[in-house]
Structure formats: C-alpha cells, structure tokens
Amino acid sequence: MLEGKRSYQRGQETLVPSNNASPIPESQVIPKAQEKPWYIQHFIKLLIGFGLGGGAVAILLPWMLWMLCDISSGSSDQLRLHLLYITGGIIAVLTLLQTNWKNQGDRLKIDADIKKNEQDAEKNERDHIRQVHAERRSRYTKAVEQLADEKAAVRLGGIYTLVGLVDEWLADGTLIPEERQKEGQVIVNNLCSYIRSPFPLALKAEVLESDIEPTDYEGTFSKDQAAFREEQDVRRTIFVEMSKRSSDVIWDDDKLIEIIPGTWSDFDVDFSRAPIFYPLSNLTIEKGNFSSAKFYSAANFFSSVFNSDADFREATFTSNVFFNEVIFFSATSFVEANFARTADFIATSFTDNTNFSGATFSSRVNLSEAEFTQSTPIFAMSISNIGVWRARFSAQADPKDYMFENSLKHTLEIRCGTAELLNRTFILPLGTVLYDPDSWDERQKEYTRLSEPAQ
C-alpha cells in the first residue's frame, strides 16, 4: 500500500452518519367492545313477549268489550285489527333497532380494520426506511475503507460511492432538509479529508510528470510515476464531481444574468493545508478554501470559476501558477501567499475585493490583462499593532517580467510607482517592496534586504 494511503487511513475523519431512523412507538388497534343496549340484550324475549302479548290482547280485549260493553261485532273486529297493527309496528321497530345496531358494529369493525391496515402500512414504511438508511451507512463505511486501498480503481470506486450517497441523502424525502444536509456534510467532510491527506510522491511531482527518468532517481521511476498519475486522477475526480453539483452561471452577451445554486452549494468544504499536485482547470469551485495549501508542479486553474470566496492565504506555489481566464465572483485573498515562479493572471476576472498583501513573488507576475471591476487589488495593507503588510517582489527578476499596466477599457487601474534595490529599478504597485533573495535570515525567517516602498 502506498504511504500516502496509509497517511489517509491514519488521518481520515472517523465520521459516521448518525442513525436518524429512531423507532417510533406503534399503537395497537384494539377496538373498544361495543356495549349492547338493553333492547338488544333482551331482543328475543321482547320479540316473543310483544308477539304473544299483542296477540293475546288483540284476542281478549275485543271479546271482553263485546261481552261487557256490548260493542258491535264490527267495532270489535276493528279494535282487534288495530291492536295487531300496533303489535306488528312495535316488533318492526325492534327489528330495525337490532339491524341498525348490527350495522353500526360492522362499520366499527371495518373502520378498525382500515386503521389497522394503515398502521401496518406505516410500520412497514418505517421498517423500509430504517433498512434503506442502514444499507446506506453500510455502503458508506465500506467506501471510506476503499479510500485507503492500494489500488487506484478501488479508491476511485469508493469516491463515486460516497458522491452517490450524498446525492441519495439529499433526495431522501423522509428526512427534513436539515437532516439531509447533515448526512451529506459528513460524507463531504470525508472527501475533503482525503484531499488534505499527505501523498509523499507529490514531493517528486515535477520529476514524475516528466517522461524522462533522471539518472539519479531514488526508487523505481516507472512504478512511482504510475502511482503518481493514478492518484492525480483520483483526487481530481473529487473536484470534478463537486463541480458538477455546484452553481450554474447564466450569461448573456458576456453579462452575468444569474447564478443558480447547485445541489451541493450549501456544503462547507475545506482544502486547507492540502497537497495539490494535479490540475484544477475547467472546474466550478463553490467554496475555495485553499489556505496554507501547497501546490506542487504547475498550479493550473485555467478557465475555472470560483462562485464564493477564494482563500489562498499563506498558500505555497512551488512552480508556475496559471489563473488564466479564471473568474472570481467573490472576495479573493492571496495574503502571505508564496509564488516561487511565474504567476500568470491573464484574462482573469476579479469581480470583488482582491488582496495580495504580504505575498511574496519570486519571478514573473502578469496582471496586465486582468480585469478588476469592483475595486483595485490591495498589495499593501496597514494593520494596527503590526504595521503595513506589503507584497514583496524579487529584485533578481527581470524588471520587464512584472507587468501591471492594463490596456483593458473596463477595469480599474493598478496604481504603480518605482522601487530600487541592487542598483535596479522596478515598476511595482504602490506600497510594495523589493527583496533580495540572497538575504534570507534563517534565524529570523525573513529577508533582511528590502527596498523602500514603491512610490
């Protein structure tokens, strides 16, 4: 296994999504026993009683009245008939009451069955959700383990799995938005942790990017070169997948119309202190926190877009830097950044504040075609109790390599002055200084020969 993978395995964040699918108490459907009314409890007795009693009254009462009161035979028959009608009506009412009570019981039973079926369906749904979430967490754990595998294909598979899991959490309609974001953020943190993990072969980036093996190379050049290129692809894939899910920029005739947030736009990302040894060109970078990052070989951001703040504070660029045709939509900071070689900002667009205070430039700087639409870039900044933080430019460079005069019509001008050191005169941004690279003091960790500020 590559040492870089071991470093990631030791240093990765032990982040496991929390289990949100907590058991929900399930109420049992126990229909309340339907209490029988008195006429139902004694229905048979009442039916027989009214039948026999009504029949007896219908026979005896007319006969007694005929005998005692001497009513006519026709009246007696009419009375008997009415008594039978009344008896039949009472029996019919009892029957209707009994039928109604039975129907009510059937309805209650049906309602209870429906409610039980609904609760069973809800329980099955909860069980399914718990199963889905558990399966996701199992895939998450396996994918994190894959990131430490010595085979690049396995690591790449782990990255695609983690990216897919983030999308699944975000699309999970069973969770509230805050929980979806929380679950996705855990996985994004792991992807960022992988980007920040050490990779020892990055120290040999310039050598391994060459097709010619040095005669004094320590190790197996072909093996190291293959591992280096594989890891370049693996780590760049993370940025590519994030870029696909970042904000979309709508243009009309080179005019910004709208920025449409992407599905991952609200996630926090952290690439600080990361070793970067692969190109980051043609990407949309939502939140570019590269503070204290170290860029090995050429730092290539050609045609990339930064939608939010771009933070390169204290970043170290060990080789050439290309921010050509890059668009910065928000504040950009290169405070105390160290540019060891060429720094090109050709056709770069800065639409918000840009700060180069305290930055160190060792070779060519080209800002001649950069566009500043919000404010002029800051190269010297006064800080209370500290003094003035000034950008520094090497006095051993060719004065013609520092290009700040801009011919673009729609840009704010970089105000420049002159500074002298080592009997050489340079045109630099106001307030900045020249330094002698040979004057480095290891004890003070500082250059001791500086020019007066450009004015």
Feature names for model-found ranges:
Residues I44-A134, S138:
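Membrane-embedded hydrophobic alpha-helical segments
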Residues G11-T14, I30, A121, D398, ...:
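Compositionally biased, intrinsically disordered low-complexity segments enriched
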Residues L2-V29:
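Short, charged cytosolic
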Residues P25-G55:
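Juxtamembrane interface helix immediately N-terminal to a transmembrane segment
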Residues T14, I30-K36, S75, L96:
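Single-register position within the heptad repeat of long, parallel alpha-helical coiled-coil rods
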Residues I129, S138-E145, E150-V163, E168-A205, ...:
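N-terminal leader/targeting and pre-domain segments
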Residues Q34, I59-P62, L81, L97, ...:
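Acidic, low-complexity intrinsically disordered regions
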Residues P37-W38, K109, V186:
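Coil-to-alpha-helix initiation sites in intrinsically disordered, low-complexity, charged segments
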